[in-house]
A protein has these predicted regions:
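Conserved FAD-binding catalytic core of PHBH/FMO-like flavoproteins
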Residues: 160-255
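Glycine-rich FAD pyrophosphate-binding loop
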Residues: 27-49
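FAD/FMN-dependent oxidoreductases across multiple families
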Residues: 233-316, 320-322, 326
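N-terminal Rossmann-like FAD-binding beta1-loop-alpha1 element of flavoenzymes
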Residues: 8-35
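C-terminal helical "tail/cap" subdomain of flavin- and related membrane-associated enzymes
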Residues: 315-411
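A short, basic/flexible loop-to-alpha-helix module at the beginning of a structural domain
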Residues: 1-7, 290
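Conserved N-terminal helical subregion
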Residues: 6-7, 59, 76, 81-170, ...
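N-terminal FAD cofactor-binding segment of flavoenzymes
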Residues: 46-80
Length: 411
């Protein structure tokens, strides 16, 4: 069944973190935005997620007007601690990220976007085709569950529809896939006492080589505990998912205290999480969030990258929507900036995800971090995605790796 054609400045496919951020920020700049979401329920949320937000996203969260809502909802600010077999714990008490379930975050952000003047939320519509004009994207065809097809014409189409992006498939923008040799099981728990660092609950990450685990504290006393296994253990773990998950979590060094805790949700598996990197833009078309770059979830970077890439796209292109040549130049700038900001982190995380033994330089850095706060801070800046992984090759940091220093000694 054919339907109508509607013109917008921007058509955003995917009303999750990246898509809602794009829609609200474009509309605040005066654009008319179609926000297209295949799930009909406005309260829908992503289930398999680490639920951690990096501190680099805080300026975007504040700009959206979301920070106050998160604070009112009781979402904690988080520090971070890391454990490795090469020296034990090192911490980052000044990290100041956010710990929020997608059950809370997604509906809050979607409501915020939908209430923004200039945004038309289209729940229950799926992208089924691209509208093209010579050499560029010019909109999307969408279909609802009754089979009605609607043509949404737009000066800019934004794929914000995740790792397996339908927009990328329809536009034939293929991703570069790097192997991921680990798989994940997540579950929510209530009653796991948070470990505090400088007064904030800490995200805790265990890099066990080759296994891994994480404890992500969230609002309402909920914690997400993640167990990470190398792919060669897939058959064994799937034969006893609950037992394998709990044995790994309970055996962690200084692990979560489960004495008074109960699991409040089912164990959710993510067995295939390929590292996908695709071109961030083409004429009339851009990708944000996981649709542009999907990487190892162990490090909890995905939500932060979604916020940041969405804001970056709007800031580069909002003033150029009325002129195709200016828009394409802005999209090229977005692509260059995206690559410089995110690709080094993607390459570092995807290299770790192949589950090879941690190399001697990484071992040395992790060992030094337990006794040298400068090294710990440098690693923390990389883990928090505040600085490029090249930070660890800074001669001042390299010197501290080569020559051990005690706390209090001069650099």
């Amino acid at each position: 069944m054919s339907g109508s054609t509607t013109d917008f400045d921007v058509a955003v496919v995917g009303a999750s973190v990246a898509g809602c951020t794009v829609a609200r920020l474009f509309a605040q700049r005066g654009a008319r935005v179609a926000l297209i979401e295949k799930r009909p329920d406005p309260a829908a949320f992503k289930v398999a997620c680490t639920h951690a937000i990096l501190p680099t996203s805080t300026p975007t969260i504040e700009r959206l007007g979301l920070a106050a809502a998160l604070v009112e909802r009781g979402v904690p600010r988080t520090a971070a601690q890391f454990w490795t077999p090469f020296g034990g714990w090192f911490g980052l008490p000044d990290l100041q990220g956010w710990g929020v379930t997608r059950r809370t975050l997604d509906p809050l952000l979607r409501s915020l976007a939908a209430e923004t003047p200039g945004v038309e939320l289209m729940p229950g519509w799926s992208a089924v085709g691209m509208i093209a004009s010579p050499g560029r994207a010019a909109g999307v065809e969408v279909r609802d569950r009754d089979g009605t097809v609607r043509r949404v014409r737009a000066r800019l189409v934004v794929g914000a529809d995740g790792r397996g992006s339908s927009v990328a498939r329809l536009a034939d923008v293929r991703g570069r896939v790097r192997p991921h040799n680990r798989f994940f099981y997540f579950a929510e728990w209530r009653g796991v006492p948070p470990v505090l660092s400088a007064g904030d609950p800490s995200i805790r990450l265990w890099l066990l080589d080759p296994e891994g685990a994480a404890h992500f504290p969230n609002e309402d006393g909920i914690a997400v505990l993640v167990a990470v296994f190398p792919r060669w253990r897939l058959a064994e773990v799937r034969a006893d998912i609950e037992g394998s998950y709990e044995r790994l979590i309970r055996a962690l060094p200084n692990g979560p205290d489960l004495a008074e805790a109960e699991r409040v949700g089912r164990i959710v598996g993510k067995l295939e999480v390929p590292n996908v990197l695709r071109a961030p833009s083409r004429p009339g078309l851009a990708f944000v969030g996981d649709a542009a770059l999907a990487t190892d979830p162990l490090f909890g970077a995905g939500i932060g990258f979604a916020f940041e890439s969405a804001e970056r796209l709007v800031d580069e292109t909002a003033t150029a929507l009325g002129d195709e040549r200016a828009l394409d130049a802005a999209l090229r700038r977005y692509a260059r900036g995206f690559a410089l900001r995110f690709w080094p982190h993607h390459l570092q995380m995807s290299a770790f995800s192949v589950a090879k033994p941690i190399n001697p330089i990484e071992r040395l850095a992790m060992r030094r971090a337990t006794t040298d706060s400068t090294v710990a801070r440098a690693i923390g800046q990389v883990m928090a995605r505040e600085r490029s992984p090249a930070r660890l090759w800074d001669p001042r940091i390299a010197a501290r790796l080569a020559i051990p220093r005690r706390e209090g000694s001069r650099a």
